[in-house]
Amino acid sequence: MDMSGPSHHKLVVYLNGKFIPKEKAFISVMDRGFLFGDGVYEVFPVYNNNIIGLEPHLNRLQDGLDAINIKNPYSNKKWISLIRKIISLNKHNINHAIYLQISRGCDKKRNHTYEELNPTIYIQSSAIKSVKKDELIKGKSAITREDIRWLKSNTKATSLLANTLYAQEAKESNAEETILYRDGIVTEASSSNVFIVKENFFLSNPSKLNCSKKFLIFIRLNLSSSFDGSLTY
């Protein structure tokens, strides 16, 4: 999803129970998401008002919260209501990437251990930029680097330092993405999935079956293409 490009409209976001202009959204400096990256996030793609893969994304959000021991503050029904409200309040975005973040919350002091806290909940909409056909045909440039991120990358943790550094390295190399590999196997890219469609085979890393990848595999299988194994580096 390409979310680049300036917006001339004022964005409305959701923060801890309130829908407010983005420029008025502030969190405490003692928030553990700010101090430690102690939280999880999820991104819901929305095209023509249709939330793509809603249930799988909500399931992954729950899995992420369970993995870091944060109680889910809302029911799925409540999350869906909030997401749809954000979409309606930001109608200037034709297609949306709905970013939802939950941190463990604010503590009284900076400490690695924690008590049960009230989570900080944030939701925003970013415009998904449409890509022209000639751009797709031309393709994008990429560099490759060894994947040295932590091994629980299926948990969508907010601490994306490694991904940020990989993306910046691509930018400084006049490339648009960094493709990552570990032990000779392609894992993913700094902010993208990686696939190769060769003849009638659909190649990707089967250990990284995230929401978008499952959706694309479903489409390919229904188009009578085969899914076959890992990409090697």
Q: Language-model features: where?
A:
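Low-acidity, Ser/Thr- and Arg-rich intrinsically disordered low-complexity segments
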Residues: 212, 224-226, 230-232
